[in-house]
């Protein structure tokens, strides 16, 4: 592996996966024949299927599932923000009690 890759021990990488430089992978799963571009981070409990292309400067957070044969364009960011800065109609700041984080599935 390249010195420009950071891959945790618990990452599952399929066959014939192509990894560019400056990639961080933590506790995720990458399917066969998938290509990951430069400056990509994929966090724990995220799954990328087979035959996918994840373009450069992409951030995939915990809980995201990308199925087989999916293209993700440049600079796509999936977020899991437990402290959003949204407000209620009366102007009070919303808290984590106002939000429910759901897994994301991309087909």
Which residues does each predicted region cover?
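Short N-terminal binding/cap micro-motifs at the start of the first secondary-structure element
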Residues: 14-15
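Flexible, glycine/small-residue-enriched loop-and-beta-strand segment within the central core
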Residues: 1-9, 18-107
């Amino acid at each position: 592996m390249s010195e420009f890759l950071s891959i945790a021990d618990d990452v599952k990488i399929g066959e014939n996966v192509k990894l560019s430089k400056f990639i961080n992978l933590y506790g995720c799963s990458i399917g066969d024949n998938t290509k990951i571009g430069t400056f990509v981070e994929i966090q724990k409990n995220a799954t990328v299927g087979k035959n996918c292309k994840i373009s450069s400067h992409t951030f995939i957070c915990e809980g995201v599932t990308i199925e087989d044969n999916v293209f993700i364009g440049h600079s796509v960011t999936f977020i899991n923000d437990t402290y959003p800065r949204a407000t209620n109609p009366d102007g009070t700041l919303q808290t984590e009690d106002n939000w429910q984080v759901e897994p994301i599935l991309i087909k």
